Amino acid sequence: MAIQGIESVMQAMQTAALQASGSKTDDASSADFGAEMKAALNKISETQTAARSQAQAFEMGKEGVSLNDVMVDLQKSSVSMQMGIQVRNKLVSAYSDIMNMQV
């Protein structure tokens, strides 16, 4: 799950780099960076919501919800959140570097 999120962010960054360098890409592969970031954030939110709801179902004693599944989903949620935080940190760092460049 986290690998797919990283791949989509990497694809968006590569597309932005190609557009900045003046290279042309075909319209099917180029995507708006903001849209890709929004999709990644929505995926993180969905993962957290699913993990929370499964944990609540386990706490209420619903049938078919095992502790193993709950723990795995909570860890997936945690890893995806950490990935999102690291991507944000890299974006802030890159923005800071660009703003500190002399023209």
From Swiss-Prot:
What organism is this sequence from?
Erwinia tasmaniensis (strain DSM 17950 / CFBP 7177 / CIP 109463 / NCPPB 4357 / Et1/99)
Taxonomic lineage: Bacteria, Pseudomonadati, Pseudomonadota, Gammaproteobacteria, Enterobacterales
Q: Which domain of life is it from?
A: Bacteria
UniProt-listed PANTHER family:
FLAGELLAR HOOK-BASAL BODY COMPLEX PROTEIN FLIE, PTHR34653
Main location group = other
Q: Which keywords belong to this entry? A: Bacterial flagellum
Provide the family line: Belongs to the FliE family.
Q: Which GO terms describe its cellular component?
A: bacterial-type flagellum basal body
Database matches in NCBIfam families: fliE (TIGR00205)
Q: What GO terms describe the biological role, i.e. biological process, of this protein?
A: bacterial-type flagellum-dependent cell motility
The name on file for this protein is Flagellar hook-basal body complex protein FliE
Give the signal peptide range.
Answer: none
